[in-house]
Amino acid sequence: MGEQPIFSTRAHVFQIDPNTKKNWVPTSKHAVTVSYFYDSTRNVYRIISLDGSKAIINSTITPNMTFTKTSQKFGQWADSRANTVYGLGFSSEHHLSKFAEKFQEFKEAARLAKEKSQEKMELTSTPSQESAGGDLQSPLTPESINGTDDERTPDLTQNSEPRPEPTQNALPFTHSSAISKHWEAELATLKGNNAKLTAALLESTANVKQWKQQLAAYQEEAERLHKRVTELECVSSQANAVHTHKTELNQTIQELEETLKVKEEEIERLKQEIDNARELQEQRDSLTQKLQEVEIRNKDLEGQLSDLEQRLEKSQNEQEAFRNNLKTLLEILDGKIFELTELRDNLAKLLERS
């Protein structure tokens, strides 16, 4: 085509599953450039998208097409020529709305272009149709007569306005035998011509059917060649689009590399956190082991403390018994001392008396 794209955007491309007519089949692994083109040679608008060198969308916009938004970021349209339904997934609702606006705009432009083309065809074909109509009226007239003058009159009424003249001239013809024989011969000639025309018409009808079949085959082959030519033209005409697409891919790759770098830094940070967590886990395990050892040591000390408490209690009991014994001995000694004191006093008194 050679034209530059009128409008371009990026989207994920899908086609309806030809078997189920329900599921979407992706035709691109990633988002690709989808462009509107104007084909000035054929006066049509096209939607074209390439995935590398392969044309995954080559749709001619017609007035009866409709672009339908099925969600906030997805839209679709049916292409009867390609016998499929295309679907586009956009990155945002804004891109979807912009594409839908352009679709409606170019659809209206296609309708106006079609109307202008039809008007031109009607203007150019009207004189030839009139001349062809005039040529066909004469052979069809004998077929409509079917052998009688009464049946020829309505046919003449359709093709010419001076209707009363045959009726006025028919009166003198009925009174003239010579003229009657002339008309009989003319009628026989017309019947023969009618039979020949009928046979020719049947043969022409058969030929027309054959020609229609051949024409359909030629049209199908022409459409296939046209699609192939369009694909080749797309490959050659979209060099700039491919360059733009390459630039966009490089930019996307750069963005992905930056994103990858950020992700790698985040992964390093997470690794560091994991190492720290492992160190904390090791410290926790070490402290847990030490705590268990301390608990075991504590149990041992508790056992020793219990033993010492028992021994202390036993010692205290022994000391208490010893004290009680000493107290008893002291009481006995006190009694003995008291008795000795009394004995001394008594002895002293006895000495004094003697």
From Swiss-Prot:
PROSITE patterns: WH1. The WH1 domain interacts with the PPXXF motif in GRM1, GRM5, RYR1, RYR2, ITPR1, SHANK 1 and SHANK3. The coiled-Coil domain forms an antiparallel tetrameric arrangement. Residues 114-172 are annotated as: Disordered. CDD domains: EVH1_Homer_Vesl (cd01206). One of its GO terms (molecular function) is G protein-coupled glutamate receptor binding. One of its GO terms (cellular component) is dendrite. This is Homer protein homolog 1. Residues 138-147, 155-172 have a biased composition (Polar residues). Keywords: Acetylation, Cell projection, Coiled coil, Cytoplasm, Phosphoprotein, Synapse. The modification Phosphoserine is found at S306. The keyword Ribosomal protein does not apply. Pfam families: WH1. The modification N-acetylglycine is found at G2. It comes from the Eukaryota. SUPFAM superfamilies: PH domain-like, Tropomyosin. Belongs to the Homer family. Residues 290-354 are annotated as: Required for tetramerization. Residues 181-352 form a coiled coil.
